[in-house]
UniProtKB/Swiss-Prot annotation:
Record field: catalytic activity: L-glutamate + ATP = L-glutamyl 5-phosphate + ADP
Name by which UniProt lists this protein: Glutamate 5-kinase
Enzyme Commission numbers on file: 2.7.2.11
Originating organism: Corynebacterium glutamicum (strain ATCC 13032 / DSM 20300 / JCM 1318 / BCRC 11384 / CCUG 27702 / LMG 3730 / NBRC 12168 / NCIMB 10025 / NRRL B-2784 / 534)
Entry similarity comment: Belongs to the glutamate 5-kinase family.
Length: 369
């Protein structure tokens, strides 16, 4: 798997705030650190890979200019810091890549962008065109307009979504930790975990919170790595200090093995990025049919319609106890579905005998465990 990552053609590289700022105050962008990172990125690109960078650090970079000594928690202050810091951050990225004659392109995304299929496609096209034109895409969450509860939460998840969005061959998550340990790596009894093949390898792992200037701790990195690996993308998790060997031969850090069958772009989007408009509760038989049998969802297996939604919107599919089993694109609006609950297909009027959610537009979590 490490060879697969080292030979990957299209790679998304995520760099955390702590890897871009200096050690003294933790909220000043360090040009030397960025230069070191860019040197390694350039070497990988010269070897033939396409790279997309997901860069944290906007809020941290805006703290010093605004006289903030601690990371802001108030949304408006955080957004102000991001607005100031993003300018500083992109300036440093631009200066560093200019040493190699490479332009950069800023791509700011929100969860709302990823949640709408047309916006997600536009972002994908922009990133692809930047690469074709020889520019390095630098992606970050648009903190100045993102709102609490409608955001990615951290750039680790954003990186996983971008990796699938651009059909990446590998995702490299860089922070200030050498890889995954079963407990805090400062504990002398902590054991390093080299490979994660499935959830069993994570049993007993204790993942802590984020650092002083970032939002994504080890828990978020593990979550993002599993998200990407479930969608078919191998992941390497290591420290920014190891970026050279990480991009050269991937013989450092922790590798998360991908699922064998890569999710289609639509199914990944529906499961992990799309906005949902309502919910549909199923009986046990319908749950079995759509999760294990790969069947379309029929009206006969539905017990409850929750919320108001339109035909073509994405809804959550629930089991009898309310557990979320998947998501799908509905063929009918909620008012129409209310009249169809529990009915056999042959008893429905003409024009209402299509599946409620066709198997091609139904993605379940059980198959990605």
């Amino acid at each position: 798997m490490r060879e697969r990552i080292s030979n990957a053609k299209r790679v998304v590289v995520k760099i955390g705030s702590s890897s871009l700022t200096n050690d003294e105050d933790g909220h000043t962008v360090d040009p030397n650190r960025i230069n070191t990172i860019v040197n390694a990125l350039q070497a990988r690109m010269e070897a033939g890979s396409d790279l997309i960078v997901v860069s944290s650090g906007a809020v941290a970079a805006g703290m010093a200019p605004l006289g903030l000594s601690t990371r802001p928690t108030e949304l408006a202050v955080k957004q102000a810091a991001a607005a100031v810091g993003q300018v500083h951050l992109m300036h440093q990225w631009g200066r560093s890549f200019a040493r190699y004659g490479r332009p950069i392109g800023q791509v700011l995304l929100t969860a709302a962008d990823a949640g709408k299929r047309d916006r997600a496609r536009n972002a994908q096209r922009t990133i692809d065109k930047l690469r074709i034109l020889g520019a390095v895409p630098i992606v970050n969450e648009n903190d100045t307009v993102a709102t609490t509860g409608v955001n990615f939460g951290d750039n680790d998840r954003l990186a996983a979504i971008v990796a699938h969005l651009v059909s990446a061959d590998a995702l490299v998550l860089l922070s200030d930790v050498d890889g995954l340990f079963d407990k805090n790596p400062t504990d002398p009894t902590a054991k390093f975990i080299s490979e994660v093949r499935d959830g069993n390898d994570l049993k007993g792992v204790i993942a802590g919170d984020g650092g002083k200037v970032g939002t994504g701790g080890m828990a978020s990195k593990v979550s993002a790595a599993r998200l990407a690996s479930r969608s078919g993308v191998p992941v390497l998790l290591t420290s920014a200090a190891n970026i050279g060997p990480a991009l050269e031969d991937a013989q450092v850090g922790t590798v998360f093995h991908p699922k064998d069958n890569r999710l289609s772009a639509w199914k990944f989007w529906a499961l992990y990025a799309a906005d949902t408009a309502g919910k549909i509760r199923l009986d046990d038989g319908a749950v079995e049919a759509v999760t294990s049998g790969g069947k379309s969802l029929l009206a006969v297996g539905i017990t409850e319609i929750i919320g108001d939604f339109q035909q073509g919107e994405i809804v959550e599919i629930l089991g009898p106890a309310g557990q979320i089993i998947g998501r799908g694109e509905v063929s009918y609006d909620s008012d129409t579905l209310q009249s169809m609950v529990g009915m056999q297909t042959q008893d429905l009027p003409d024009g209402m005998q299509r599946p409620v959610v066709h198997a091609d537009y139904l993605s379940n979590y059980a198959s990605r465990a």
